[in-house]
Amino acid sequence: MRRRRLLKGFASLPVVASTAVAANDIPTYAHGVASGDPDNNSVVIWTRVSGLRKSQPVSWQVALDDNFEQVVCSGVEVTNQYQDYTVKAVAKGLDSGRDYFYRFACDGVSSPVGKTRTLPTGQLEKLGLALASCSNHAFGYFNAYDAIAHDEAIDFVLHLGDYIYEYGATGWGAETALSLNRAHTPINEIVSLQDYRERHAQYKADSDSQRMHAAKPLLLVWDDHESTNNPWVGGAQNHQPADEGRWIDRRDIAIRAYYEWMPIREPNVGAERKNFWRR
């Protein structure tokens, strides 16, 4: 694709919605941008486009500078309701151990700019890692994410799981959530695909979380609460088949939402999404 054509999607605001999107469906980026799963020469970039009601192309760029005068790779992805209007792209052909900037555009509306980094190679004098886990929105403390975002010594964020929690209005943390005005969305325990999507959306809408995701690439693995508490192959401590259906269905729904909403690569050919390890 010619760079001139791609840049049309990154026009300055305000913009007039084209016929591709209805006038009352102007795209927004309410959940920010994120990057993750880097290797030595590529990284996943992510966003979600709100305000769409049908399939729509989304342009993206990766550059050496935040003014995007030195674009090194670009492309177009198509998003739709079947992926909850999330967008993921693997930016390839990058240099190892280098910072990059990225952004998206849909129907002339540009996303916030994110900053990411590829994994280094060879011997290192230092490497800055932030460790995060067990991030229950109900309890607050997401200001730790803001601190990570502003720490220039941190290169990558290693998130060891429990990125979201599944509980509802009467579950763990509910009283604290009410006192902090951080009640769960949706209010019920999450079971359906729409439930899991809404819970991920709540976490990604948090301003501290958005700052971290826009500033640092994540290395991710899930734990148990991305689906529900203490699962095993045949069920989970916090799953009641009589009321919540088959465990395997809930597990697969949770994994689908996770892949939609997180900056993580799709499994290699022949691998399954439920396998969180790689060869």
Describe each model-derived feature in a short phrase.
Residues 34-35, 79, 268, 279:
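Short Gly/Pro-enriched turn/cap motifs at secondary-structure boundaries
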Residues 15-20:
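Hydrophobic h-region of N-terminal signal peptides that target proteins for export
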Residues 29-30, 41, 83-85, 110, ...:
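Residues that act as N-cap/strand-start positions at coil-to-secondary-structure junctions
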Residues 123-144, 149-278:
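Active-site neighborhood of divalent metal-dependent phosphoester/pyrophosphate hydrolases
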Residues 57-126, 138-142, 146-147:
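Extended acidic/polar, glycine-enriched regions
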Residues 21-57, 117-120, 130:
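Non-catalytic, glycine-rich low-complexity segments
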Residues 1-14:
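N-terminal secretory signal peptides and thylakoid transit peptides that target proteins
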Residues 33, 113, 275-278:
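Short, acidic/polar N-cap/turn motifs at the starts of alpha helices
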